[in-house]
């Protein structure tokens, strides 16, 4: 159910800084039209840390309504507060999301037993499939393969992981520990090719915000075993993967989307709605390299 190119959607804002519902709905529609295989609203790229709870919930509702069951919606529902994560998960279920993406608790650095308890409590509170988001670079805690396997065994609704550890061997380790049916989605665009070769089935992608058709075609090629085609597309996309992350990814993605005429380049503080000139030039060059801009 969850595979292929799944953009971690940006959340457009108006010039005044409020959520731009019309632009968000248009972005969802474009993503589906261009071939994206799923959608993730209110993840890190959706600026969830600086959305209010009401805004967070509204964006999930907008995404579910706009997508109209054409592709699965995996709603962000993470928090370092278990009670808060349960509330967001229950809202996503009520709103009609197909699954939830739950990040490992950040800042408070729980033990592996604490991680197990956190995810178990969420799994017991909703019937939705849960995708673990393991990103030690941001959360400063790394869910071990053993903890992940124990969760998958104890709670069948914990169906997969978005892996942003940067350790490609983890895909094989998790496949052996959690089983072949456990859904593994890359959390890093640049390494998605190798990730899928190790047994992954897709990518929750930042770049797909900007190049949805290319990212969808890339994923389809890898999943079909057509690595010659996948490499050709990887070569087109790699400069964009790299350039977008020269500064915080959402800033790079929104700048690129603005250059393509799709939305304003407005982010919330402490992020800045401006890029260093060298970053902007690199993104422009990458857009041209990918054939997205003249």
Swiss-Prot record:
The active site is at residues 133, 162. Keywords: Amino-acid biosynthesis, Cytoplasm, Diaminopimelate biosynthesis, Lyase, Lysine biosynthesis, Schiff base. It is an enzyme of class 4 (lyase). InterPro entries: Aldolase_TIM, DapA, DapA-like, Schiff_base-form_aldolases_AS, Schiff_base-form_aldolases_CS. Pyruvate binds at residues 45, 204. It comes from the Bacteria. It catalyses: L-aspartate 4-semialdehyde + pyruvate = (2S,4S)-4-hydroxy-2,3,4,5-tetrahydrodipicolinate + H2O + H(+). PROSITE patterns: DHDPS_1, DHDPS_2. Pathway: Amino-acid biosynthesis; L-lysine biosynthesis via DAP pathway; (S)-tetrahydrodipicolinate from L-aspartate: step 3/4. It is found in: Cytoplasm. The record marks 44, 107 as: Part of a proton relay during catalysis. The keyword Electron transport does not apply. GO terms for cellular component: cytosol. Its EC number is 4.3.3.7. One of its GO terms (molecular function) is 4-hydroxy-tetrahydrodipicolinate synthase activity. Disulfide bonds: none annotated. One of its GO terms (biological process) is lysine biosynthetic process via diaminopimelate. Belongs to the DapA family. Catalyzes the condensation of (S)-aspartate-beta-semialdehyde [(S)-ASA] and pyruvate to 4-hydroxy-tetrahydrodipicolinate (HTPA). NCBIfam families: dapA. Homotetramer; dimer of dimers. This is 4-hydroxy-tetrahydrodipicolinate synthase. The gene is dapA.
């Amino acid at each position: 159910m969850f595979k292929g190119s799944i953009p971690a959607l940006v959340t457009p804002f108006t010039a005044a800084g409020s959520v731009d519902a019309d632009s968000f709905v248009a972005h969802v529609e474009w993503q589906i039209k261009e071939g994206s295989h799923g959608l993730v609203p209110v993840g890190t790229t959706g600026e969830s840390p600086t959305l209010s709870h009401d805004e967070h919930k509204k964006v999930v509702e907008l995404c579910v309504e706009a997508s109209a069951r054409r592709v699965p919606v995996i709603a962000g529902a993470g928090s370092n507060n278990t009670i808060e994560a349960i509330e967001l998960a229950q809202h996503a279920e009520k709103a009609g999301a197909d699954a939830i993406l739950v990040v490992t608790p950040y800042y408070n650095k729980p033990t592996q037993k604490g991680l197990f308890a956190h995810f178990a409590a969420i799994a017991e509170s909703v019937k939705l499939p849960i995708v673990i988001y393991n990103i030690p670079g941001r959360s400063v805690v790394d869910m071990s393969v053993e903890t992940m396997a124990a969760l998958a065994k104890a709670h069948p609704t914990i169906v997969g992981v978005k892996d942003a550890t940067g350790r490609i061997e983890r895909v094989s380790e998790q496949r052996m520990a959690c089983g072949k049916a456990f859904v593994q989605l890359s959390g890093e665009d640049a390494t998605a090719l190798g990730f899928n070769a190790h047994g992954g089935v897709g990518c929750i992608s930042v770049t797909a915000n900007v190049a949805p058709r290319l990212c969808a075609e890339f994923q389809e090629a890898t999943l079909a075993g057509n690595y010659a085609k996948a490499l050709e597309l990887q070569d087109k996309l790699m400069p964009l993967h790299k350039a977008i992350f020269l500064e915080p990814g959402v800033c790079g993605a929104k700048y690129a989307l603005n250059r393509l005429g799709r939305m304003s380049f407005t982010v919330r503080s402490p992020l800045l709605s401006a890029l260093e000139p060298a970053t902007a030039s690199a993104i422009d060059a990458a857009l041209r390299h990918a054939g997205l801009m003249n």
